[in-house]
């Protein structure tokens, strides 16, 4: 399993880091088989697999539950778990309780938190306690209401400079990596050059140290539309619908199950069962 040291070395050597979200045992198992470097159990699971309109309703218990499943499916892959909405915007003591629960109960190797400002002290606090932290800047979904929607961040020089400053503060606080979401590629490149920790981009162009995509977006599974930054490498959704539709048809027309899908009794047992009448 790769560790923080390996990811730093990959950045130094110019080897891109691959990160993929996974929310359950089968997706984690497949991600590990595909040799993904890092798995993110994102609170995006609220929208992707739980059907919420945002990530806000996701709880600490949800994150623990899903991370445990991912851990069972990917025992040899570094796993990062999101701290959900309002689980770390409380006192540092309450934040530690939530962080401890997620790490101890789920088996996550690191936690991810969004934003800067007061979150910087949280990064430092968790790091000092021995919990690796991944920072997240740019479009931060938990704050989408404050940001005015799902929009690209850092498009003007002033806001771009603020993001650069925040990125440096995250590194200084002890973050082991930084996710940059929906920022101009020029800004992402500049931030990547000025940090010693790896940057993982999602909608941040190619000049970052790694990329992350949502599993379901990448394979077109259960999604109707995807953001501009997503490349769909295959479409399992069409095959799944086709297969289920065929199943429905065959059941309705009594083509399924066939004899090869059924179990039988010996003829003499049937005679006993039917009282000698068939």
Curated annotation (Swiss-Prot):
Reactions mediated catalytically: 3-methyl-2-oxobutanoate + (6R)-5,10-methylene-5,6,7,8-tetrahydrofolate + H2O = 2-dehydropantoate + (6S)-5,6,7,8-tetrahydrofolate
Record: residues binding Mg(2+): 43, 82, 114
Subcellular location: Cytoplasm
Annotated binding of 3-methyl-2-oxobutanoate, by residue: 43-44, 82, 112
A matching Pfam family: Pantoate_transf
Disulfide cysteine pairs (residue numbers): none
Cofactor stoichiometry and binding remark: Binds 1 Mg(2+) ion per subunit.
E.C. numbers: 2.1.2.11
Alphabetical UniProt keywords: Cytoplasm, Magnesium, Metal-binding, Pantothenate biosynthesis, Transferase
Pathway stated in the Swiss-Prot or TrEMBL entry: Cofactor biosynthesis; (R)-pantothenate biosynthesis; (R)-pantoate from 3-methyl-2-oxobutanoate: step 1/2
InterPro entries: Pantoate_hydroxy_MeTrfase, Pyrv/PenolPyrv_kinase-like_dom, Pyrv_kinase-like_dom_sf
Signal peptide feature range: none
Recorded GO CC terms: cytoplasm
PANTHER family, per database record: 3-METHYL-2-OXOBUTANOATE HYDROXYMETHYLTRANSFERASE
Name of the protein in its database record: 3-methyl-2-oxobutanoate hydroxymethyltransferase
